[in-house]
UniProtKB/Swiss-Prot annotation:
Enzyme Commission number(s): 2.7.4.3
Subcellular location, record wording: Cytoplasm
InterPro entries: Adenylat/UMP-CMP_kin, Adenylat_kinase_CS, P-loop_NTPase
Protein name: Adenylate kinase
Protein encoded by which gene: adk
Record keywords: ATP-binding, Cytoplasm, Kinase, Nucleotide biosynthesis, Nucleotide-binding, Transferase
Comment, domains: Consists of three domains, a large central CORE domain and two small peripheral domains, NMPbind and LID, which undergo movements during catalysis. The LID domain closes over the site of phosphoryl transfer upon ATP binding. Assembling and dissambling the active center during each catalytic cycle provides an effective means to prevent ATP hydrolysis.
MF annotations from Gene Ontology: adenylate kinase activity; ATP binding
Organism of origin: Nocardioides sp. (strain ATCC BAA-499 / JS614)
Amino acid sequence: MRLIIMGPPGAGKGTQAKYIAEHFKIPAISTGDIFRANVTEGTPLGVEAKRYMDAGEYVPDEVTNRMVRNRIDEPDAVGGFLLDGYPRTVAQVEELDGMIRFTGHRLDAVVCLTVDQDEIVGRLLQRAQVEGRADDTEDVIRRRQDLYLEQTAPLIEIYKQRDLVHEVDGIGEVDEVTARIFQALDVIPES
């Protein structure tokens, strides 16, 4: 199964990705985690990505595409994967289409979490305090929200035209949202 989870920063994608990936026995691949790992390791891609992340901007497509391609080529992703935070641009949609087509497979579904903007800002500010994430200041959060609406939200329309989008209300307890996702995907969660 090849899935994408979309929604604005703070919508709960990472949390839900863990449950979806566990159910389908596929890796949850988060571009945020890939970026942070490269930054921590001080790789050339990580140094470049850090400049953009610190400014609350998205990392350029060519850097992101290389990181994602390398990750989905790893053995644990051969049978499928769940992407969190990719694609974010039309060019990345086209790049991902090519990556998946090259393997002889297709994208199965896009889960789109919908969450109120004020709820998101509150979630991210709380997460910044708990996790000590320096990239989650209020100004950076609002900038990412603006970038999401401007650049990423239109991708949902592309996937809607392909009849792949399953919109799910992301407000509520984690298990409630997970149940909605499985219902949208017509999957009965295992206990």
